[in-house]
Amino acid sequence: MALDYRKTFEIEIINEFQSAIHSKMLNYVLNNELDKSDSTNLQTNLLNQLSNMNQINLFKLSLEELEAYHEYLRSIKKYADSITRTT
């Protein structure tokens, strides 16, 4: 099995980034005492989506797919930032 250091690096970055977003959403849901099983709640839906995304085997994706996935996570982070912002 050949090592692809660029792909491995991208996977590590994605894993850390995804974990940070998940932690932010989990803290928000817990701090606001939201029901994690409430499918009508936007914040809990995003938390559940992030939890499900942790199950994806990133090593099966191509570098191009990883880069697209990373961009998707950037969009999710912007969205998570906007819905967890306190005034």
Swiss-Prot record:
Keywords: Plasmid, Toxin-antitoxin system. It comes from the Bacteria. One of its GO terms (biological process) is response to toxic substance. Disulfide bonds: none annotated. GO terms for molecular function: toxic substance binding. Coiled coil: none annotated. InterPro entries: Antitoxin_epsilon/PezA_dom_sf (IPR035569), Epsilon_PezA_dom (IPR015090). The keyword Lipid metabolism does not apply. Antitoxin component of a type II toxin-antitoxin (TA) system. Neutralizes the toxic effect of cognate zeta toxin. Part of a postsegregational killing (PSK) system involved in the killing of plasmid-free cells. Continuous synthesis of the epsilon antitoxin is required to counteract the zeta toxin. Belongs to the epsilon antitoxin family. In the presence of the zeta toxin, forms an inactive PezA(2)PezT(2) heterotetramer. This is Antitoxin epsilon. It comes from Lactococcus lactis subsp. lactis.
